[in-house]
Swiss-Prot record:
Organism: Rickettsia parkeri
Protein location: Cell outer membrane
UniProt membrane topology term: Lipid-anchor
Record bears the keyword Signal: yes
Protein's recorded name: 17 kDa surface antigen
Top-level taxon in the UniProt lineage: Bacteria
Pfam families listed in its UniProt record: 17kDa_Anti_2, Rick_17kDa_Anti
Cysteines engaged in disulfide bonds, as pairs: none
Keywords per UniProt: Cell outer membrane, Lipoprotein, Membrane, Palmitate, Signal
InterPro entries attached to this UniProt entry: Anti_2, Gly_zipper_2TM_dom, Surface_antigen_Rickettsia
Family statement drawn from the similarity comment of this UniProt entry: Belongs to the rickettsiale 17 kDa surface antigen family.
Lipid addition sites, S-diacylglycerol cysteine: 20
Length: 154
């Protein structure tokens, strides 16, 4: 089974367990933890080979889950949707070093994505480094990452 498939199975299982938390299902922090962990694991899988790659997945998942949980605790559905759409637009079309912003007029939360260096990884995928900054309830948090274009164009 490919590493990505394993990550997706873990994310799906975690999601189903989170949904069993009672009325209302998964809360914002749980969602942030899950998505951050899955994203961190995917990011970590881009580095190293063999055991080194597994270490990268573990470290990425842990760091992503912690940061995602902290950010998710204060983000609502609209914040997440705006951040996701902005991230996609920034990584696909924005020049390196430019800030692409989002702002939720209902709660005042905002953030921006700054795409940086574009490169090809060891498997030939086009990738891009980025910084994501969010300000939730007046508190700023930053995350750094890499996103790679998948063979299906996503």
């Amino acid at each position: 089974m490919k590493l990505l498939s394993k990550i997706m199975v873990i994310a799906l299982a975690t999601s189903m367990l989170q949904a069993c938390n009672g009325p209302g299902g998964m809360n914002k922090q749980g969602t942030g933890t899950l998505l951050g962990g899955a994203g961190g694991a995917l990011l970590g899988s881009q580095f190293g080979k063999g055991k080194g790659q597994l270490v990268g997945v573990g470290v990425g998942a842990l760091l992503g889950a912690v940061l995602g949980g902290q950010i998710g605790a204060g983000m609502d559905e609209q914040d997440r949707r705006l951040a996701e759409l902005t991230s996609q637009r920034a990584l696909e079309t924005a020049p390196s070093g430019s800030n692409v912003e989002w702002r939720n007029p209902d709660n005042g939360n905002y953030g921006y994505v700054t795409p940086n260096k574009t490169y090809r990884n060891s498997t030939g995928q086009y990738c891009r480094e980025y910084t994501q900054t969010v300000v939730i309830g007046g508190k700023q948090q930053k995350a750094y990452g890499n996103a790679c274009l998948q063979p299906d164009g996503q």
